[in-house]
A protein has these predicted regions:
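Intrinsically disordered, low-complexity serine/threonine-rich repeat tracts
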Residues: 30-58
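Bacterial Sec-dependent N-terminal signal peptides
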Residues: 1-10
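Active-site-proximal alpha-helix that buttresses catalytic centers in soluble enzyme cores
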Residues: 51, 55-268
């Protein structure tokens, strides 16, 4: 009797264990199914987000392609041969806006050409993205720095003067100086100018220029803001220095900010 009772208890325990195991298995299967479903939903959301981003990027590129930036043919790319023995290479970051390129970079190049008539003035851009964009959109070729230097060598230039239009002694300027050093043996004489904001006198000259150009707006009630791009390099300090020097000279309604660094737009 005791043996029969024990066997019944064992059988009951086995059934219970099997039932528990079955429930546990069902729970595991349910959990696995839920995880798989969640992962599928997340993957779908990520794919949708990527597709949306690609569509937005394509739309932005299409808008930019359709935006009229002016006639590219009016801009002198200054990548002609027959340079002569003396060249003045003007190096700029660059812009893909045709009218802006002609009225800013082009105007500087023209002014330099008038000031130094004994030199052939040529152009070099440091932004390959801009060079490629202009080429693709307008079929206009602009030399990068390497191409400009190679062109100078091929044309037998002996005296090369390089003047950047960069604002500060930052990463772009450092790269330029390094590339010139690597190619200096190709010329008899090489010289490179400094960025716009190098000495205190440079800051004072720029302050004089920008405040004179905007003095009609300095009525005591209008905030006059100048925005720069900004950089992670230490050279970004030029923006705060410009702000401080403006205040020191009594231009309390003048503000300096950057798009991607400090002073930020919120600071302004």
């Amino acid at each position: 009797m005791k043996l029969k009772k024990a066997m019944l208890l064992f059988a009951a325990a086995a059934v219970a264990a099997g039932t528990v195991a079955g429930c546990s298995g069902s729970a595991k299967e349910t959990t696995a199914a839920s995880v798989a479903e969640t992962n599928a939903e997340e993957t779908k959301e990520e794919t949708t987000a990527e597709e949306t981003k690609e569509e937005e990027t394509a739309a932005e590129e299409e808008d930019e392609e359709n935006y009229d930036t002016g006639d590219a043919a009016l801009d002198n790319t200054r990548n002609q041969d027959e340079i002569g023995e003396k060249e003045l290479l003007v190096v700029s970051f660059g812009t893909s806006y045709n009218d802006s390129r002609r009225l800013t970079v082009g105007a500087i190049e023209n002014a330099i050409e008038n000031a130094f008539p004994d030199y052939s003035v040529r152009r070099g851009f440091t932004s390959q993205i801009i060079i490629d964009h202009v080429k693709k959109r307008d079929n206009v070729s602009i030399d990068n720095v390497t191409e400009a230097l190679n062109r100078a060598v091929d044309n037998g230039v002996k005296t090369l003067v390089v003047q950047p239009t960069h604002l500060m002694n930052g990463l772009e300027y450092t790269d330029l100086v390094n590339e010139l050093a690597e190619n200096s043996d190709a010329f008899e004489h090489v010289a490179v100018g400094e960025p716009l904001l190098t000495s205190d006198d440079d800051f004072k000259a720029v302050i004089s220029a920008i405040t004179d150009a905007t003095k009609e707006y300095d009525d005591g009630e209008t905030a006059i803001c100048f925005m720069g791009h900004g950089t992670e390099a230490d050279s970004n300090a030029v923006y705060q220095k410009m702000q401080d020097m403006l205040k020191e000279e009594g231009f309390d309604n003048y503000y300096v900010g950057t798009v991607e660094a400090t002073p930020s737009l919120d600071d302004v």
